[in-house]
Structures are given as structure tokens and as C-alpha cells.
């Protein structure tokens, strides 16, 4: 595969949006893949245990009103999104690139690290599929804690061996819930589903993103206070 940089410019910052294209094919000939290569640094099922228990997760699910119907509509969303992940990531990376205070977390001495951005992008695409298709079991819970540690100073930059800001501040984990939710609805509506199905997919996505962002905040909170 040949990695092609597509430049997106928004606001004051320009960053490349990295997309995969098969060698010797034109953009018109390239169709979105329905399968994803395992991203570098993606270690699902190979991480330590989360201190958050399944009982705790059940209570969190109840708090955001997440139930079996949401699981059903997340699976539907996974089918809708599986060939749109690059487009979703283009939009999200454009959003990050348009805000210097966000791209700052992927930078060293004021310069964005393009390889780092590319590696994170690949895992971000996998996260979209995981949030839709993975069962929210102990293995999933463990990996949310691993993701949390990779945002926190505990493991920030370690996965990719880069020099960049040593922590992503918790306020942006929470603040990012809205743009990641608000921008998804148009993508969910692109495959001809009824308005009701789109609303239910979007609601399930919102609940799932809220839960995962909440779980990612755990390392930032004093023991016993999360």
C-alpha cells in the first residue's frame, strides 16, 4: 500500500490527512475497503486489567440509558460506517487541525508530528469499528483503560515512541464528545436508512461515546473518586 497525504487546511493550521491507496490505482479506481489492517500499536486483548469492574460498567450503562436496543443499532451503524471511516477521519482531523490548541498535543517544539498523527489516525479508525461492533465485556473494558493511559501522562507517546506533549488534558476528552457525536449523523444517514433508524443509530453512538470518554478519564481522577 502507498500512503498518500491529502492536505486539509482549516483555520491557521495545515495538517495532512493520511489515507491508504493501492499502488498504481487512480482515486476513481480505488474503492473503500470493508476490512481494516491491524493498526500499529493496536493491542486489543493484550493489555492489563481495568480497575473499573463489570458491575461498575453496568451502572454506567444504566446511567446513560444504554441497553440491548442500542447494541442493535450500534451494529447497524458499524455496517453503515465500515466503508466511510476515512471520510469520518478526514472530517475529524480537519477539525483538530483547525484548532492549534488541539493539534498541539501531537506536536514537538511547535511542529506537528505527521507520523504520530498518521499512527493515531489508524487506531482512531479502528476505534470507530470497535465502538460499533465489539461486545462491551471485560476485554473491551480493559482496552478502554489502556486507551485512557495512552492519553494520560502514564503512557502518552510511549506506544509510538514519539516526542510530543506528555498528556492530553482531561477537559478535551470530555469536550470532544460533542464534535464526535454531532458530525456522525450525516454519515449514518448516507445508506438509505429510515429517519427513525438514523436517529436510533445516532443516539446509540452518543451513549457509547459518552461512556468511553468517561472511562478514559479514570487515570486523571484521584483513587476512590472516579
Regions inferred by a protein language model and the residue ranges of each:
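Short N-terminal segments immediately surrounding and downstream of signal-peptide cleavage
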Residues: 22-36
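Heme-based O2/NO sensor domains and their adjacent alpha-helical segments
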Residues: 57-62, 67, 82-187
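Intrinsically disordered, low-complexity terminal regulatory regions
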Residues: 32-95
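Short terminal or interdomain "cap/linker" segment that borders an active site or interface and mediates
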Residues: 32-40, 48, 52-63, 190-226
Amino acid at each position: 500500500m502507498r500512503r498518500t497525504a491529502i492536505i486539509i487546511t482549516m483555520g491557521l493550521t495545515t495538517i495532512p490527512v493520511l489515507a491508504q491507496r493501492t499502488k498504481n490505482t487512480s482515486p476513481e479506481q480505488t474503492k473503500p475497503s470493508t476490512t481494516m489492517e491491524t493498526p500499529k500499536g493496536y493491542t486489543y486483548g493484550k493489555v492489563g486489567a481495568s480497575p473499573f469492574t463489570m458491575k461498575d460498567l453496568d451502572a454506567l450503562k444504566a446511567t446513560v440509558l444504554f441497553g440491548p436496543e442500542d447494541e442493535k443499532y450500534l451494529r447497524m451503524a458499524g455496517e453503515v460506517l465500515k466503508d466511510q471511516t476515512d471520510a469520518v477521519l478526514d472530517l475529524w482531523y480537519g477539525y483538530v487541525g483547525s484548532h492549534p490548541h488541539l493539534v498541539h498535543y501531537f506536536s514537538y517544539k511547535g511542529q506537528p508530528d505527521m507520523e504520530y498523527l498518521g499512527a493515531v489516525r489508524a487506531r482512531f479508525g479502528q476505534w470507530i469499528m470497535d465502538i460499533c461492533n465489539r461486545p462491551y465485556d471485560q476485554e473491551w473494558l480493559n482496552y478502554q483503560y489502556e486507551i485512557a493511559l495512552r492519553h494520560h501522562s502514564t503512557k502518552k507517546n510511549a506506544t509510538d515512541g514519539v516526542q510530543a506533549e506528555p498528556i492530553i488534558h482531561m477537559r478535551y476528552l470530555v469536550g470532544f464528545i460533542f464534535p464526535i457525536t454531532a458530525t456522525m449523523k450525516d454519515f449514518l444517514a448516507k445508506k438509505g436508512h429510515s429517519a427513525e433508524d438514523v436517529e436510533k443509530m445516532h443516539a446509540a453512538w452518543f451513549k457509547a461515546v459518552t461512556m468511553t470518554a468517561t472511562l478514559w478519564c479514570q487515570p486523571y481522577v484521584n483513587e476512590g473518586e472516579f
